[in-house]
């Protein structure tokens, strides 16, 4: 084989060796671009416009509000009242951030605020609620996470707005803040109250 032929073969073999690396780098760049472009609060929910899932969660043992035990949570809780369901956990850092806002929101008597405690130890959940104040009229313990999966929860915190008819009207992914409350959640609550 001539020197020119060997050089061409060597060049082709280098290209063939580099081709998978180039393809991998292109796919990795595309993945990172799409990952950064997404807004997690805009994750779709197939449950919007549908009735709440059927579930029955036990109460957090020993949890009280105003000297009375806080009941567990089931789909029957949502009939007849505009309700915010907050999925939370004591180990969730953004849940700590939103807890004071939820306590403030619980004073709005037009809505009821309930919670699902997600994959948490009861002692930790109680300590969390006693630290920040318990905003919930009912809180279900979802230690295995099955009910949260039925709700389509991606991670905590997530908040669902349920109308008086027991149908899910809106879903907010991430912590409730004063800004996203006034911009998105409050208008949805006002619609549900009409």
Where are these regions (language model features)?
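Short pre-active-site segment immediately N-terminal to redox-active cysteine/selenocysteine motifs
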Residues: 81-83, 88-91, 155
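Conserved segment of the thioredoxin-like fold in thiol-based oxidoreductases
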Residues: 105-144, 156
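Thiol/disulfide oxidoreductase modules built on the thioredoxin-like
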Residues: 14, 130-135, 141-193
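Conserved Rossmann-like nucleotide-binding pocket used by diverse enzymes
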Residues: 53, 88, 114, 149
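N-terminal targeting signals for export/organelle localization
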Residues: 1-62, 194
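Conserved redox-active cysteine motifs that mediate thiol-disulfide chemistry
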Residues: 87-104
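A short beta-strand-turn-helix
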Residues: 55-83
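Hydrophobic beta-strand core positions in alpha/beta domains
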Residues: 84-86, 115, 161
């Amino acid at each position: 084989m001539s020197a020119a032929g060997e050089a061409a073969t060597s060049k082709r073999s280098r290209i063939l060796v580099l081709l998978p690396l180039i393809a991998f780098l292109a796919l990795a760049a595309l993945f990172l671009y799409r990952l950064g472009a997404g807004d997690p609060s805009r994750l779709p929910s197939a449950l919007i416009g549908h009735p709440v899932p059927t579930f029955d969660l036990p109460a957090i043992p020993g949890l009280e509000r105003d000297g009375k035990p806080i009941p567990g949570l089931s789909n029957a809780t949502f009939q007849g009242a505009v309700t915010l369901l907050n999925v939370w956990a004591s180990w969730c850092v953004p849940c700590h951030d939103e807890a004071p806002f939820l306590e403030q929101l619980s004073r709005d008597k037009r809505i009821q605020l309930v919670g699902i405690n997600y994959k948490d130890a009861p002692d930790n959940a109680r300590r969390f609620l006693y630290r920040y104040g318990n905003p919930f009229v009912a809180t279900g313990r979802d230690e295995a996470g099955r009910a949260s999966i039925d709700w389509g929860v991606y991670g905590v915190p997530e908040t669902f707005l349920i109308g008086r008819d027991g149908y899910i009207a809106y879903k907010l992914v991430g912590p409730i803040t004063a800004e996203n409350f006034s911009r998105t959640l409050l208008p949805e609550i006002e619609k549900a109250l009409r």
